[in-house]
């Protein structure tokens, strides 16, 4: 598991109140993990903070699974 994947799963677990062990990369935030629209907004904000990046609203709407969040972070995270 990559560092980014681990960090995304940790954020998802904290934001949605689910166990990290229950989070699969194909998990949908809404359908599988029980997120509502407010949860998804808070999740995007937490991802922005964690990875020091900005996710435009039109992109945020497309991030609906753990894998999509990981892929977005990998593509947009600032190189250390």
UniProtKB/Swiss-Prot annotation:
Residues 2-77 form the Carrier domain. Pathway: Lipid metabolism; fatty acid biosynthesis. The keyword Hydrolase does not apply. 4'-phosphopantetheine is transferred from CoA to a specific serine of apo-ACP by AcpS. This modification is essential for activity because fatty acids are bound in thioester linkage to the sulfhydryl of the prosthetic group. InterPro entries: ACP, ACP-like_sf, PP-bd_ACP, Ppantetheine_attach_site. Keywords: Cytoplasm, Fatty acid biosynthesis, Fatty acid metabolism, Lipid biosynthesis, Lipid metabolism, Phosphopantetheine, Phosphoprotein. GO terms for biological process: lipid A biosynthetic process. GO terms for molecular function: acyl binding; acyl carrier activity. The modification O-(pantetheine 4'-phosphoryl)serine is found at residue 37. It is found in: Cytoplasm. GO terms for cellular component: cytosol; membrane. Belongs to the acyl carrier protein (ACP) family. Carrier of the growing fatty acid chain in fatty acid biosynthesis. This is Acyl carrier protein.
């Amino acid at each position: 598991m990559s560092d980014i994947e681990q960090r995304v799963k940790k954020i998802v677990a904290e934001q949605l109140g689910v166990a990290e062990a229950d989070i699969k990369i194909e998990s949908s935030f809404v359908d599988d993990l029980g997120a509502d629209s407010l949860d998804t907004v808070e999740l995007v904000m937490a991802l922005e903070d964690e990875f020091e990046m900005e996710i435009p609203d039109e992109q945020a709407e497309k991030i609906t699974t753990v894998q999509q969040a990981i892929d977005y972070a990998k593509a947009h995270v600032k190189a250390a």
